[in-house]
Amino acid sequence: MELSVHTFVSLDGVMQGPGGVQEDPSGGFDRGGWLVPHTTEGQLEPVGEWFGRADAILLGRTTFEMMRTYWSQVTDPDNVVATALNTGQKYVVSNTLTDAGAAWGKTTVLRGEDVVEQVRRLREQPGGELQVHGSWQLVRTLHDAGLVDVHRLIQFPVVVGAGKRLFDGGAVPSAYRITESHVAAGGSGAVALTLRRTASGTTGAGEFVVRDGRESTA
């Protein structure tokens, strides 16, 4: 399976608490819900497409508990996101959860210190996509281990100014290419992007130079 990461992100890279004031107040974050005023009809349509591709979903503990609380209440059979989360295979990284499966459908808890190797083995299973949603700390761990194949983002035209960022200081340098992009419906200016890891995965380096009076690269 490919490992894909799905994120709502601000112009300054913040991914913390986009959907509500109390969604993730950890670290004293008091700017939760920053996405909501910028959401218009049709703008989040790509999210349904994301979940429609999922063979399994991988979450960190905090995101798992937040999603379980909210999405387990959604019983609309036409809601693609709710169907994927409530009935599909889920994996949650946690050393403390004990009732995940009983409380929310088909859920397997990944325990221990070898999370990267456990996820690596999941990727080796047949299937389409192993999807990560939210899960800031887990995403950073998987990125630094070189396990993320695809990022799908919806970037909103707002600067939050504080909070957990998708790529904070010290992230392993990596290169991606944009394979899909479009301005989301609704007119607020949000941009949906799909970025696929390049074959080398490295950023490389170069410089601009002038040769015979012409600008070039080296």
Place the predicted regions along the sequence by residue.
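Enzymes that bind and transform nitrogen-containing heteroaromatic metabolites
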Residues: 1-218
